[in-house]
């Protein structure tokens, strides 16, 4: 088994980190740069910052927030939200991001994946998929989980890979913020359908939840927000517990 990654997520609106349950009832969690630095120091392998209202509000990414956060980091930094063109991606990279995440814009115009990948490399392109379970599998939602698309999550992940995505960030909308565990079945379905890394998101609450999504869900990385922001767990202790279960981790010194 390859080394698995623990990723801390910052959902940002109006320049502040927020966290809710199933994309609703958002609570303030703090300053993005401060939280990113804290999570990095505690052993997170990567930071993901998602400007969760940029698409819905029809604006670009909060570049100053990205810049201030990037200045505090020494680990890979992914930024998403409001990226609609290769030029938008370039501005986010210039602000300090190592990778960009695209979601709604890729659903509207899938060739955007190829455009950004050809310019910056597939390794820099993460396609984010927000999915909610239905009778036949899981449906992809756009615009921060507000708009159903009719697309099947597994089929869209396959297409994203074919178009040149370097990673998939899969969020279970049903599990998001619940701390009841990742959707291992959905994660395994997507992981088995593609060859690129899949990041599982939504539902982290205990170390065992991470172990389950790595072992049963076949995830390459697991992302969490509220358990890190509100002090339920930190990456260092989490990694130690996972390593004790023979799950390969990059352990902090």
Swiss-Prot record:
Q: Catalytic activity, per the record?
A: 5-[(5-phospho-1-deoxy-D-ribulos-1-ylimino)methylamino]-1-(5-phospho-beta-D-ribosyl)imidazole-4-carboxamide + L-glutamine = D-erythro-1-(imidazol-4-yl)glycerol 3-phosphate + 5-amino-1-(5-phospho-beta-D-ribosyl)imidazole-4-carboxamide + L-glutamate + H(+)
Q: Where is the active site?
A: 11, 130
List, alphabetically, the Gene3D superfamilies matched. Aldolase class I
Q: Does the keyword Amino-acid biosynthesis apply?
A: yes
Q: Does the keyword Cytoplasm apply?
A: yes
Q: Which UniProt keywords apply?
A: Amino-acid biosynthesis, Cytoplasm, Histidine biosynthesis, Lyase
Q: Where in the cell is it found?
A: Cytoplasm
User: What residues form the membrane-spanning segments?
Assistant: none
What GO CC annotations are associated with the protein? cytoplasm
Q: In which pathway does it act?
A: Amino-acid biosynthesis; L-histidine biosynthesis; L-histidine from 5-phospho-alpha-D-ribose 1-diphosphate: step 5/9
Enzyme class label: lyase
Example GO biological process: L-histidine biosynthetic process
Broad class of the protein's primary localization: cytoplasm
Q: Which family does it belong to?
A: Belongs to the HisA/HisF family.
Record function comment: IGPS catalyzes the conversion of PRFAR and glutamine to IGP, AICAR and glutamate. The HisF subunit catalyzes the cyclization activity that produces IGP and AICAR from PRFAR using the ammonia provided by the HisH subunit.
Q: How does it assemble?
A: Heterodimer of HisH and HisF.
Protein name listed in UniProt: Imidazole glycerol phosphate synthase subunit HisF
Tell me what gene encodes this. hisF
């Amino acid at each position: 088994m390859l080394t698995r990654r623990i990723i801390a997520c910052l959902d940002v609106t109006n320049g502040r980190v927020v966290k809710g349950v199933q994309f609703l009832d958002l609570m303030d969690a703090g300053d993005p740069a401060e939280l990113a630095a804290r999570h990095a120091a505690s052993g997170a392998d990567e930071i993901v910052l998602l400007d969760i209202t940029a698409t819905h509000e029809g604006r670009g990414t909060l570049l100053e927030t990205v810049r201030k956060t990037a200045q505090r980091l020494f680990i890979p930094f992914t930024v998403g939200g409001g990226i609609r063109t290769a030029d938008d991606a370039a501005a986010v990279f210039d602000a300090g991001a190592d990778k960009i995440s695209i979601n709604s814009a890729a659903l509207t115009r899938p060739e955007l994946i190829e455009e950004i990948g050809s310019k910056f490399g597939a390794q820099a392109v993460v396609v984010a998929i927000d999915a909610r379970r239905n009778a036949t599998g899981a449906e992809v939602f756009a615009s921060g989980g507000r708009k159903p698309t009719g697309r099947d999550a597994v089929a869209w992940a396959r297409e994203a890979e074919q178009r040149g995505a370097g990673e998939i960030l899969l969020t279970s909308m049903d599990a998001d913020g619940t701390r009841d565990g990742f959707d291992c079945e959905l994660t395994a379905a997507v992981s088995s359908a593609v060859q690129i890394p899949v990041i599982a998101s939504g539902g982290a609450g205990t170390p065992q939840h991470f172990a389950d999504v790595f072992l049963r869900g076949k995830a390459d990385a697991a992302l969490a927000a509220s358990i890190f922001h509100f002090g339920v767990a930190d990456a260092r202790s989490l990694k130690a517990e996972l390593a004790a279960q023979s799950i390969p981790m990059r352990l902090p010194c």
